[in-house]
């Protein structure tokens, strides 16, 4: 399944706030549809979701927030299961340590998709070398920065959006547009509202 390239607010209406997907706020609090919110028996009561639907929704939150394909997510679930600890928390840690997510969390881009473009176009340096693979996984003590010849471009980009940095595991130098990964991300620092256990349960018979 390829990455979604359609209307972002449509996804937000269906899944809820996705900070990595868009900064725009959704003014409608019901899922997208031709006739507005669904009603049961003509009243305001919502139709109860099945357990499968609830798990699917949590899985889709991860996919759309981090901008990854179904195949990539399944691969990350497999990797998380191999490591010691809570599979769900390790899965989130892997996704948050992707280079595109780190660039977004540093406030160098308004969305993860925008961060991916910066990386693809060669604007990002990791440990002294240009890296153009957004899915590269960062490690503790990695040094990440904007390339010297890209500094003005990124500084101009920063003026086009509002970003509040909330990543205590990253040591940031805003003036030099650089940072060091000081620790693995703690669970409470993940900005996405997600029940990762339901995602693991969704894939329990698939991987």
Swiss-Prot record:
Residue ranges of every copy of the S4 RNA-binding domain listed in the record: 97-158
Localisation: Plastid, Chloroplast
Residues covered by region (Disordered): 22-51
Keywords: Chloroplast, Plastid, Ribonucleoprotein, Ribosomal protein, RNA-binding, rRNA-binding
Function comment: One of the primary rRNA binding proteins, it binds directly to 16S rRNA where it nucleates assembly of the body of the 30S subunit. With S5 and S12 plays an important role in translational accuracy.
Quaternary structure, from the entry: Part of the 30S ribosomal subunit. Contacts protein S5. The interaction surface between S4 and S5 is involved in control of translational fidelity.
UniProt-recorded name of the protein: Small ribosomal subunit protein uS4c
Lineage, opening ranks: Eukaryota, Viridiplantae, Chlorophyta, core chlorophytes, Trebouxiophyceae
């Amino acid at each position: 399944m390829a990455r979604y390239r359609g209307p972002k607010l449509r996804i937000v209406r269906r899944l809820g706030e996705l900070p990595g997907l868009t900064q725009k706020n959704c003014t409608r609090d019901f899922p997208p549809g031709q006739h507005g919110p669904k009603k049961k028996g003509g009243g305001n009561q919502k139709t109860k979701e099945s357990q499968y639907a609830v798990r699917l929704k949590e899985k889709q939150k991860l996919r759309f927030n981090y901008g990854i394909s179904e195949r990539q997510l399944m691969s990350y679930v497999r990797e998380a299961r191999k490591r010691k600890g809570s599979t769900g928390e390790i899965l989130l840690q892997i996704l948050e340590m992707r280079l595109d997510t780190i660039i977004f969390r540093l406030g160098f881009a308004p969305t993860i998709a925008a961060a991916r473009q910066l990386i693809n176009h060669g604007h990002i340096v990791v440990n002294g070398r240009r890296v153009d693979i957004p899915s590269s996984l960062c490690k503790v003590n990695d040094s990440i920065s904007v390339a010297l010849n890209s500094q003005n471009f990124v500084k101009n980009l920063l003026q086009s959006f509002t970003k509040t940095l909330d990543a205590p595991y990253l040591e940031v130098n805003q003036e030099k547009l650089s940072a060091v990964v000081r620790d693995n991300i703690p669970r409470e620092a993940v900005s996405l509202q997600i029940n990762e256990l339901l995602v693991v349960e969704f894939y329990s018979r698939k991987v």
